[in-house]
Design a protein with these regions (language model features):
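Alpha-helical residues within the helix-turn-helix
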Residues: 39, 56-57
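A short alpha-helical element within helix-turn-helix/winged-helix DNA-binding domains
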Residues: 35-41
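C-terminal regulatory/oligomerization modules of transcriptional regulators
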Residues: 2-5, 82, 100-160
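Key DNA-contact positions within bacterial/archaeal DNA-binding proteins
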Residues: 46
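Short helix-capping/hinge SLiMs at alpha-helix to coil transitions
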Residues: 25-29, 75-76
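Beta-hairpin "wing" of winged helix-turn-helix
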Residues: 59-73
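Basic amphipathic alpha-helical segments that dock to polyanions
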Residues: 24, 51-56
Length: 160
């Protein structure tokens, strides 16, 4: 049986969180606006306001208010761990209803090994995310074609 899609799926909130961080990482030091990201990624400004608020609350970005305000990364991209960001933005990692203590109890829970398998899969998924930083997800800067270093030489004055 072939599997063509992942079962583990991030919420839209986490997807937008990661897109926001990738956008900020691609624009180092520059203040970015919610409108800019909303237009670039076709995301609702209202959703992005929640994302930006949460990223600011978690100390991942810094926000500057005012007419010329915006937001930028609060840390270097290599210091932002993707696993940590996903854990902060996802409400839970329940793979099945039996994982949720408040969910519908399953009659098979005492004899079922599926919960252990899914738990291990979730741990492996998060471990993979932990291996990456924002820097590792950013594209390499494009080489500037034809760029040649310029060296300036000063003429020495002629001594008599």
């Amino acid at each position: 049986m072939g599997y063509t899609s992942l079962i583990m799926r991030l919420t839209s909130f986490t997807d937008y969180t990661l897109r926001t961080l990738l956008h900020l990482g691609s624009n180092p030091g520059r203040l970015v606006t919610i409108q800019e990201i909303a237009d670039m990624h076709n995301i609702s400004k209202n959703h992005l306001m929640k994302v930006v608020h949460e990223l600011g609350r978690n100390g991942v970005i810094e926000t500057i208010r005012g007419r010329n305000g915006g937001f930028r990364l609060a840390h270097k991209p290599e210091d932002i761990n993707i696993g940590a960001v996903v854990r902060q933005s996802e409400s839970d990692f329940y793979m099945a209803e039996c994982f949720d203590p408040g969910g519908n109890p399953c009659g098979l829970v005492k004899a079922c090994a599926l919960k252990g398998v899914l738990s291990n899969a979730t741990k492996a998924y998060l471990a993979e995310l932990d291996r990456h930083t924002l820097a590792s997800l950013l594209p390499e800067p494009a080489p500037r074609d034809g760029a040649v270093p310029i060296t300036f030489h000063r003429k020495e004055s002629q001594a008599a």
